[in-house]
UniProtKB/Swiss-Prot annotation:
HAMAP family: 23SrRNA_methyltr_H. The keyword S-adenosyl-L-methionine applies. One of its GO terms (cellular component) is cytoplasm. This is Ribosomal RNA large subunit methyltransferase H. Homodimer. It catalyses: pseudouridine(1915) in 23S rRNA + S-adenosyl-L-methionine = N(3)-methylpseudouridine(1915) in 23S rRNA + S-adenosyl-L-homocysteine + H(+). Specifically methylates the pseudouridine at position 1915 (m3Psi1915) in 23S rRNA. The gene is rlmH.
Length: 156
């Protein structure tokens, strides 16, 4: 099983890349995290936010593995605890197949793409920088895995 993070945006600061890499490398080989960056569309006078999101959605869908479980990150998504994420991770491992977490661009995710997602989740009620979301998601996936393994990283 592979955990894939598909994120709109590229050319992140080095500290974002280092933070993401730190948590990604901690994952076991059978549950590795891969990042696929999607080039953001430029908004101009003739391109509305809706148009930009549609164009980005097409790129996102092209980056998704066939048959994967898509989980979209959205400010109106389900608020999970880390323990609930760990329970979900265990269930996904038992079901098999790849999991793709989708992080939208500056305007968010296209509504049609969100409708295709199996689940909408949010990391916080706060508005977060998109680069930071990558790091936080990777950390939470590592923490969820550590809970399933009784690893001392997560302390109650």
């Amino acid at each position: 099983m592979q955990l894939l993070i598909v994120a709109v945006g590229h050319k992140m600061p080095s500290w974002i890349e280092e933070g993401f890499s730190e948590y990604a490398k901690r994952m076991p080989p059978e549950l590795r995290i891969e990042l696929r960056e999607i080039k953001p569309e430029q908004r101009s006078g003739s391109r509305t936010a809706a148009t930009v999101m549609q164009l980005e959605a097409a790129r996102i869908e092209a980056a998704l593995p066939k048959g994967c479980r898509m989980i979209a990150l959205d400010e109106r998504g389900k608020d999970l605890t880390t323990v609930a994420l760990a329970e979900s991770l265990t269930g996904w491992q038992q079901e098999g197949g790849d999991i793709a977490f989708v992080i939208g661009g500056a305007d968010g995710l296209d509504p049609a793409l969100k409708a295709k997602a199996r689940t909408l989740i949010r990391l916080s009620s706060l508005t977060l920088p998109h680069g930071m979301v990558r790091v936080l998601l990777a950390e939470q996936l590592y923490r969820a895995w550590s809970i399933t393994q009784n690893h001392p990283y997560h302390r109650v």
